[in-house]
Amino acid sequence: MPTAPSRPFVRCKKTVLLVGEGPCEWAFLKHLVGLMQTRSGAFAAHVENAHGGSPDIVLHSTKKLLAQRAYNVCVVLMDTDRPWPTSLARNIGKTRMVYVRATPCLEGLLLQIIAHKRSSKNTTTDACKRLVYDAYVVERHRTEPAAYAKHFPIELLLKSRERCPALDEILRELQ
């Protein structure tokens, strides 16, 4: 009697949901995923935009996204220019949550990655935005992932992991 053909081995990928506070965070996260993801890679990533607002609104949007599909990990990138809730869920359902602080904003994180000489953790949000949009990212294209390609190549991002813990947290989940 012939035996049934064996079923092919299917490896399950780690699924990652990345949520950006607004359209600029979405574009930067989309740029990172584009650099790190391959078709046969170890993870499948989906990037969403929470459409701005307070951290509470961003977390509410994230919970709604997690109710639609199952993910292994959810990375939420938010600015610190507004106060965060005092307690953050470590898990939502079966999804592990990772909260990444862009201090004071995404543009501040970008300046940390580049190691810009005139920026520090005490630089204001407006000053960070002015520095980034004057020198690195064309302001009218800041919501497009391709706008980050020239000044934020994979080599720089990997080299910046040690001095930029927020970037390291994101990249760790994309491996």
What kind of region is each of these model predictions?
Residues 1-15, 26-49, 56-175:
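C-terminal accessory helical subdomains adjacent to catalytic cores in phosphodiester-
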Residues 17-21:
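Short hydrophobic beta-strand that contains or immediately precedes a catalytic carboxylate
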